Curated annotation (Swiss-Prot):
Residues 1-63 are annotated as: Domain I. It comes from the Bacteria. It holds the Pfam family RuvA_C. Residues 150-203 are annotated as: Domain III. It is found in: Cytoplasm. The RuvA-RuvB-RuvC complex processes Holliday junction (HJ) DNA during genetic recombination and DNA repair, while the RuvA-RuvB complex plays an important role in the rescue of blocked DNA replication forks via replication fork reversal (RFR). RuvA specifically binds to HJ cruciform DNA, conferring on it an open structure. The RuvB hexamer acts as an ATP-dependent pump, pulling dsDNA into and through the RuvAB complex. HJ branch migration allows RuvC to scan DNA until it finds its consensus sequence, where it cleaves and resolves the cruciform DNA. This is Holliday junction branch migration complex subunit RuvA. GO terms for cellular component: cytoplasm; Holliday junction helicase complex; Holliday junction resolvase complex. Has three domains with a flexible linker between the domains II and III and assumes an 'L' shape. Domain III is highly mobile and contacts RuvB. The keyword DNA damage applies. GO terms for biological process: DNA recombination; DNA repair.
Length: 203
């Protein structure tokens, strides 16, 4: 499964971009907001969600981990598929969705073309607990360290990734906190690499 692509934008369509990675062109579906950010010939890194359906494999690309997380989160709502999830992310940022759900603001979603009153209500009801859960794992780290470039959702994603790589949750949280304390401007990729390197050096 493809999790990330790094390459140059070859061309774009109405709902997709072709990323050239070492001469191989990958067709990646993306939100209007993401497509509007990409420039032909420029180099980008996209976080990829891979969907395999019978004989077809579709790739969905995102500039941030938060967008990828919320793309999957939106699809957990009854009645929302990949197209609608991308459509919502074309209108709202992950932060917008988070705030709207926490405030039970259905009108934010109803304002999006194609989202009716019933679907807007389901989004708020079905995501209420899930959004809170995503936020809680990293909110303390965010607040205590005054992190500028790593959001709560991204911090929590790093912690979950480290747990999947063999860390206990306590070890992962301490690793993230320690590394960001020393380098608040560190990127997510470097944060994970540093955590793994530090752990291996302790064995």
């Amino acid at each position: 499964m493809i999790g990330k692509l790094s390459g140059k934008v070859d061309s774009q369509g109405d709902d997709y971009v072709i990323i050239d990675v070492n001469g191989v062109g990958y067709l990646v579906y993306a939100s209007d907001k993401t497509l509007g950010t990409l420039a032909e010939g420029e180099f980008y890194k996209l976080f990829i969600e891979t969907h395999v359906r019978e004989e077809h494999m579709h790739l969905y690309g995102f500039l941030t981990l938060e967008e990828k997380i919320f793309f999957n989160l939106l699809q957990s709502v009854n009645g929302i598929g990949t197209r609608m999830a991308l459509f919502i992310l074309s209108s709202l940022t992950p932060s917008d969705i988070q705030i709207a759900v926490n405030n039970e603001d259905k009108n934010i979603f109803k304002a999006i073309s194609g989202v009716g009153a019933k679907l807007a209500e389901r989004i708020v009801l079905e995501l209420k607990g899930k959004v809170a859960k995503i936020s809680s794992g990293s909110a303390i780290i965010k607040e205590s360290l005054n992190i500028k470039n790593i959001t709560p959702v991204a911090s929590n994603e790093v912690i979950k990734a480290l747990v999947n790589l063999g860390f206990s949750r306590f070890e992962a949280q301490n690793a993230v906190q320690g590394i960001i304390t020393q380098n608040p401007e560190i990127s997510i990729d470097e944060l994970i690499k540093t955590a793994l390197k530090n752990r291996n050096s302790n064995f």
